Amino acid sequence: MSVLSPLIIRLCSPRGFCAGVDRAIQIVLLALKKYGAPVYVRHEIVHNRYVVEGLQQRGAIFVEELDEIPEEHRNQPVVFSAHGVPKSVPEQADRYNLFYLDATCPLVSKVHKQAMRHQRHGRHVILIGHAGHPEVIGTMGQLEKGAVTLIETIEDALHYQPDDPDKLGFVTQTTLSVEDTAGILDVLQRRFPALEPPAAESICYATTNRQNAVKAAALGSDLFLIVGAPNSSNSRRLVEVAERFGARQSILVQRADEIDFDRLGPLSVVSLSAGASAPEIIVDEIISAFRERYDVTIELSETVVEMETFLVNRELRNVILTPQDMAFVNGQSETLKNKN
């Protein structure tokens, strides 16, 4: 029997689901328990294929627009995704007489309120974010067309010409890189000294915490694996942060079977984290895949303990959600005990 080579896996904490993602998934599951299938969900509830497929198996039906819901099912509940939606979406739901449950992350809702506050004070709103991201579409859709300008890059910030440079306020997409945001803000604040910040930090606590955990584990890592989907903004940022802070290579994977072990080369230290929409059960799966090939020692790299939780919608608070209901995403193994 061959002897397995030793391997240290640095397991980042915090990692994976944030309170907003956890709440959104719970809302879909609770709606299924209370109202029965099907429950419609506008857009992916979170950007993770495994989560979406798991909810589909339990009776959720995902649509991109409300008019995709058949008329005979318009008495069934519809859930809005964690990313938030433009104001036009609940207005359309009201026109269709749909019963909807809003799973928008409370921190995204806070950004919406900050944008509206800027407008009430007569300011044009600058949104720092990525075009086409559902959260950006939702935030821009809180105000009338033309009231928000999207700034994606430092180049955008350098060339932006407002109508009134003394009447500007900004908000940011919650899942942006802290460093990327800082560079854009530095340009904007130098060009427009009167630029008004939001009353509270727009970048989500979980985004910052996961980036800090990756920074702490990156140096000395032969490989840094980030569990997440290609369309997950916060997961892609973690890959960038890992490389920027010293990992020899950093890879985004959705499942263990995407890892090409034959091409990884010699490994002594592998660091492992997960984006805010990536389930813990995939972290378990990846560790198991490494255990089949290496003599693995787990080292927990913890930077902060997260205690945040968000209440689900009032209509669902009388429904009991069991650990078994969430087992398809949370997993059952030893890594779960290491996650805060």
Swiss-Prot record:
Gene Ontology annotations of biological process type: dimethylallyl diphosphate biosynthetic process; isopentenyl diphosphate biosynthetic process, methylerythritol 4-phosphate pathway; terpenoid biosynthetic process
Q: What is this protein called?
A: 4-hydroxy-3-methylbut-2-enyl diphosphate reductase
- Cofactor annotation: [4Fe-4S] cluster
Family to which this protein belongs: Belongs to the IspH family.
Where along this sequence does the record place binding of [4Fe-4S] cluster? 18, 105, 204
Q: What is its EC number?
A: 1.17.7.4
Q: Which UniProt keywords apply?
A: 4Fe-4S, Iron, Iron-sulfur, Isoprene biosynthesis, Metal-binding, Oxidoreductase
The protein's gene is named: ispH
Question: What binding details are noted for the cofactor?
Answer: Binds 1 [4Fe-4S] cluster per subunit.
Q: In which pathway does it act?
A: Isoprenoid biosynthesis; dimethylallyl diphosphate biosynthesis; dimethylallyl diphosphate from (2E)-4-hydroxy-3-methylbutenyl diphosphate: step 1/1; Isoprenoid biosynthesis; isopentenyl diphosphate biosynthesis via DXP pathway; isopentenyl diphosphate from 1-deoxy-D-xylulose 5-phosphate: step 6/6
| Entries under NCBIfam families matching the protein | ispH_lytB (TIGR00216), PRK01045.1-4 (NF002190)
According to its UniProt entry, the function of this protein is described as: Catalyzes the conversion of 1-hydroxy-2-methyl-2-(E)-butenyl 4-diphosphate (HMBPP) into a mixture of isopentenyl diphosphate (IPP) and dimethylallyl diphosphate (DMAPP). Acts in the terminal step of the DOXP/MEP pathway for isoprenoid precursor biosynthesis.
Q: Which organism is it from?
A: Bartonella quintana (strain Toulouse) (Rochalimaea quintana)
A single Gene Ontology MF term assigned here is: 4 iron, 4 sulfur cluster binding
